[in-house]
A protein has these predicted regions:
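Mixed-charge, glycine-accented linear interaction segment located at domain edges/termini
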Residues: 110-163
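Short, surface-exposed beta-strand/loop "edge" segments at domain boundaries and coil↔beta transitions
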Residues: 19-20, 79-81, 105-113, 145-147
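A generic structural motif
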Residues: 14, 101-105, 140
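Beta-strand secondary-structure signal
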Residues: 69-73, 99-101, 134-138
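Short secondary-structure boundary segments
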Residues: 18-19, 81-92, 147, 152-161
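Solvent-exposed edge beta-strands and adjacent loop segments
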Residues: 1-77, 116-130
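Short, acidic/charged, Gly/Pro-enriched secondary-structure junctions
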Residues: 83-111
């Protein structure tokens, strides 16, 4: 039993509808295994606002909300189809809004849910890795709750259980 939700992960995708992730399990599709160590969720601190008076003393302070970006690389393998939402990209822009789940191989650790995101993809090629599709999902404020949520992967996924 792990303590951290690190290491190899399973990624799932679904279309986001009206700012929410679908509740039906059949609407979620597992993505191909990403390139090793390419999956990461990055948090960017919000812009701070500080009111200062003459002399530099702080009168008030208001922190801005964080923003989140999920990134991962998928190999373009011979004989394997890329997910259809990736193939619909026009010059790198994937139409629609998307939801993502990140689950550790060890289901005793917390899983991550992004209910609403916009996506872009970038193709690259190297002799080391072949053709890679770099996926960048910029998380948007969902219909309810926090932009990034955590849930218990041991039980069947239910968006309403995400906190």
């Amino acid at each position: 039993m792990a303590v951290l939700n690190w290491g190899e992960c399973n990624l799932f995708h679904a279309d986001s509808t009206a700012g929410a992730a679908p509740k039906e399990a059949e609407k979620w599709k597992e993505l191909p295994t990403p390139k090793e160590e390419s999956t990461q969720l990055t948090t960017e601190a919000g812009s701070d606002k500080t009111a200062t008076e003459e002399g530099g003393a702080i009168v008030d302070y208001m922190p801005g909300k964080n923003t989140y970006t999920l990134e991962f690389d998928l190999f373009k393998k011979a004989g394997e189809e890329l997910p259809d939402w990736i193939t619909k990209a026009v010059d790198g822009v994937v139409p629609g809004e998307h939801a993502f789940r990140i689950e550790s191989q060890d289901k005793s650790t917390a899983a991550i849910l992004i209910e609403r995101a916009v996506v872009r993809v970038e193709d690259s090629y190297s002799t080391t890795d072949g053709t890679l599709i770099h996926v960048t999902a910029k998380a948007l404020k969902p219909k309810e709750g926090n932009t990034v949520k955590y849930y218990d992967a041991k039980t069947k996924f239910q968006p309403s259980e995400a906190a």
